[in-house]
Amino acid sequence: MRTAVRSSAVRSAKKQQQHRIRTVARAEYGASGTSFYTTTEKQDSYPSLENILDKHCADATLKACIKELLDGCADITEALRSALVTVEGTDNSFGDKQLSVDVIADNIMWDLVKSSPTIAYGASEEEPVMVKCSGSDYTVCWDPLDGSSIVDNNWAVGTIVGVWPKNTGTGDDGMLGATGRDQVCSMVALYGPRTTVIVTLDDGVYEFSYGCTPEGCQLPDGSFEPWICSRMNIKINEDSKIFAPANMRAAQDTPGYKAL
């Protein structure tokens, strides 16, 4: 009898301790108890895309180009929500098997680039040949869907974009010798539980979030639009843990991965 009472008391004490741990976890971590909330404080509303570009992108033509590229990221977001991932039976120029979502994302980017009044040349990782477009100002190169091989497992994937002034380098397309330092803008879109796009502007790096609610994202004036600025002046800490699930093979022989 005494043993049973002691066992019951131990179980009760353990439950109380677990409850305290869960309470602390909820106070310090995200709702799942497994990940920190972002350091961004909750606000009733956030700056609009237009507001940030007006303040932090002095070139009106570049501003228009950025907005067009973000429209492309929004279209890819919607396509990924409904597209079935299938093998197309074709390879890209690097010998990678193309998936349906690769082709869909690349077609969205090409449609945008070829119709843009600001883009003079375009090239895709799927077929890295510079194509003359109808615009007049920039050369845009992109990977339409980085990590597409894991999208069917519901991992996050992304679009990577670089923007250069046309004729930055030499050669017929003006890109021979051009480097990343010559870019006037770069963008990384992440399509996960939500879509965010990291964009470099005149004075730093900004994060824009897409479609925060079915109505859109709320602005300071109470209205809604597709994009809001969710973080400003983003920096990568010198000591960070960054892991790429699509690069698991590197964990076998890369010391940095093992150290995680």
Give the role of each language-model region.
Residues 1-32:
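N-terminal mitochondrial targeting presequence
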